[in-house]
């Protein structure tokens, strides 16, 4: 572990303690004229880095892959994955882990360059990334962080001075991604597919030490690992659903063992409440639609359980039973987390038998009247019932009376209930049309002011500030249906 005291780099490379089949050591491919277009000051400071130093030419070179900080050990990680249900051997096709930053508080975070050039896993790709998708990941990941949804984060975006060629010629860019780790369900699938139980154990032991040290001495630690990952994913997916977030590409290589959201390619936030909402242009069957996300998470976790079967128990039948028993607990844990979150969104402290019905009635009405998901809860929080089809309907007025009498029966005051709602119903989300406006200004006009203003508003989604109101409006009909593309 080497520390550069001026900038604060303090890199370790624990991933290289795994068998070499899990990665390939390879340097990033240099670019012609890197330019820093976005730096995350607050994240840099939390990592123990000095923002002013990071703006210097030598540090910008690091973000571009033209140089490496002391202690860096660049490598591309190998993994597999079910992509829309089809199994493939994969790997970092355009990203490199340059090291693990140890923060002043002793936490460990992967520092990864995304768009850093081809690797042995590129599968004929150029290993590069376009500016628009990299800025998009920056905006959405930082919005998720502000919403208190576990996520990878974005430290910096640099332009490369070189074009990337997709459907058209686009400006190239590299994103510096920060994650608790990049270990995925697909990493375990990769280990299992190769057939080495020793390699599988090495990966499981490393993962436990890194993410779940509290279970290291557990009698059945590999079962405990599966339990912990299920618990974190149940919590994560509940938070997605509560915020109206649609990931769009829940392949097993995009499900982290740490429980963080990763890969912001075709993701988007729901406008009108609709269980069938799909934004991704490639998800033609709606596999990863909003309402399917909990089921797909369970499916992905079942693939993790399958991968762990050789080390769950020496008897295969017993191992299979353990795997099935643990996976069956996901839906119970998810439902519990989602229900608790929904109660908070409606200001319900106590438990009453009809609470489930109260929540379901509201959601059914929202779907029937195509009500905006975020703004409906925002209006309820402000007790500002606007002139919309939902709020004007007789069934909503009846529901509203039931809800108000439910609030009246609580020991806590209505003021406390509305305060809890305010802390759980964001006033602002990264609306798809607003994100596109920011990207258009930055990529086409080299104007980052629109993005900066949007990021500032998104940084405090529960503020209910008048400054944010312009970002609360849903898109005009001309901006629908919104389609996303897997540009990251």
Curated annotation (Swiss-Prot):
Its cofactor is Mg(2+); Mn(2+). It catalyses: L-seryl-[protein] + ATP = 3-O-(5'-adenylyl)-L-seryl-[protein] + diphosphate; L-threonyl-[protein] + ATP = 3-O-(5'-adenylyl)-L-threonyl-[protein] + diphosphate; L-tyrosyl-[protein] + ATP = O-(5'-adenylyl)-L-tyrosyl-[protein] + diphosphate; L-histidyl-[protein] + UTP = N(tele)-(5'-uridylyl)-L-histidyl-[protein] + diphosphate. Keywords: ATP-binding, Magnesium, Manganese, Metal-binding, Nucleotide-binding, Nucleotidyltransferase, Transferase. Signal peptide: none annotated. Mg(2+) binds at residues 254, 263. Transmembrane segments: none annotated. Belongs to the SELO family. This is Protein nucleotidyltransferase YdiU. It comes from Bacillus cereus (strain ATCC 14579 / DSM 31 / CCUG 7414 / JCM 2152 / NBRC 15305 / NCIMB 9373 / NCTC 2599 / NRRL B-3711).
